[in-house]
Amino acid sequence: LDRATQLALVAAHEAMTEAGISGKPEDAHRFGVYAGVGFGGAQTVDSLYERFYTLLHDTSQPGRNPTVMHPLSVPRMMANAPAALVSMRYGLNGPSNTYSVACASSAVALGEVFRAIRDGYLDAAVVLGTEAMLTPGALMAWNALRVMARPNVTDPARSCRPFSKDRNGFVLGEGAAAIVLESEARARARSRQALSELCGYGCS
């Protein structure tokens, strides 16, 4: 699995555990997975290019074919892989949707779940956001945009200062987060204490 998917599975596990859900829910057909993913399988893509160009120029291994890749390369790199794997892990048969809206991807995923529950299409969903782009190719691509922060040599932790007046760019990171969003009726039926309430959503 690509690292972005691995991170998503861990986050989803924590969210499901927090929500008191283990195994396949009885209402799995009304339980979806909505993911926000900006790119997806960056690690997989980078490793494919590395293998291809290494074997293409490696004269010490004349019998190795640089075009022969792992048969699951495409499913690993697809942006919908995290949502698909979480759906399969928990046997969730509701919609498995992925939104790619740059930095707003997981926020849009959350809002669309809100609408689906409000309008009666779903009762619950795992909402997740994941990204893992700490690869040579991704770092060079972001650096080419001239948006990366210049490193603070004396205190590297201060390189990322998005709200400072002397900020000079951002620091690329990786991670995943997930929550379980469900209708109030479903939460009450399970005698679960809600951690928060989502009251609205807009997107333009």
Where are these regions (language model features)?
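Conserved beta-ketoacyl condensing-enzyme motif
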Residues: 1-101, 130-139
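Active-site-adjacent elements of ketosynthase-type condensing enzymes
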Residues: 42-50, 132-160, 178, 202-204
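Short conserved active-site loop signatures built around small residues
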Residues: 106
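Short, high-confidence coil segments that cap the C-terminus of an alpha-helix
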Residues: 121-125
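Condensing-enzyme catalytic core mediating Claisen C-C bond formation in acyl metabolism
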Residues: 153-204
